[in-house]
């Protein structure tokens, strides 16, 4: 049974286009299912976060990351008696707007889009689920519930100041109450994202031999995790020791979130989800001590992983891919795929063209972006380029 402050599918604010309710699935379950079946979700399989895909199949992709986030989010939501289906829907959709090549690709596309309103991956996720997915007869997008859209827009907190154009375009006609916090379910999805990437960046960095377990054992939280494993399992081999320490690290983060949220909810005594939205700060977050420890860990990862020479070289390569594809399609929109050329025929400004080109490039997988760059810019194939 969910708590009174949980989001209730029976009281959901509805969809942009009214639909008949399902006999067997709640409105939030339908949102989750539509996200899973979306083309943009499938493409996450070939989009990476730090390592570009052709550097190795082992490293996490946006898809595996999203699945891990959803698993963590459901665990936390269950412990707090929240709606797990809404939590999972937001968790699965939170990365839909990401470009190829992780944050490097986003930085490059954002630079290209600066004269045209910029690019923001969270706003792009809204654009995808409200406009760019075009499979249904009655509407563009996925026609998700207000609660899921709110969660995508505000899972990192209230949106204030300059609102990204892609989000503003939707919010101007369908108010998502951007100045308030999102539901507890959306907040859980956001913190689950933090838990998942802190955990798997450490794992992937070790796998890539960018740092050692001895170095990790000197970091906060992780020092206790490795010490406990060594005490319980002296002589454990390297791989099992690494796994046991990292799973404990994972558990520490999840337990910290749950325990702090329980205490915060006990103090606030929210009666409805409206009370969650009106709170003076996020309900779901890390404790101050754990947050400070994570800052130390993120600083370590920034220096040893994100600035690693091999990663820096790849970043330069993929930045060039985006920086050369964008002006190419701006100059030659006739080389966009047929369905995109139809959109171009209906526009009347350079800004509208840039946004179509941005939509197209941001939806590319790492592999396809490399192929298109080789074909269109160099007149070769990736195989020929690599020789």
From Swiss-Prot:
Keywords: Hydrolase. PANTHER family: DEOXYGUANOSINETRIPHOSPHATE TRIPHOSPHOHYDROLASE-LIKE PROTEIN, DEOXYNUCLEOSIDE TRIPHOSPHATE TRIPHOSPHOHYDROLASE. Residues 1-26 are annotated as: Disordered. InterPro entries: dGTPase, dGTPase-like, dNTPase_2, HD/PDEase_dom, HD_domain, PHydrolase_assoc_dom. This is Deoxyguanosinetriphosphate triphosphohydrolase-like protein. Signal peptide: none annotated. Transmembrane segments: none annotated. Pfam families: HD (PF01966), HD_assoc (PF13286). NCBIfam families: dGTP_triPase, PRK01286.1-1, PRK01286.1-3. One of its GO terms (molecular function) is dGTPase activity. Belongs to the dGTPase family. Type 2 subfamily. Residues 17-26 have a biased composition (Basic and acidic residues). Residues 62-198 form the HD domain. One of its GO terms (biological process) is dGTP catabolic process.
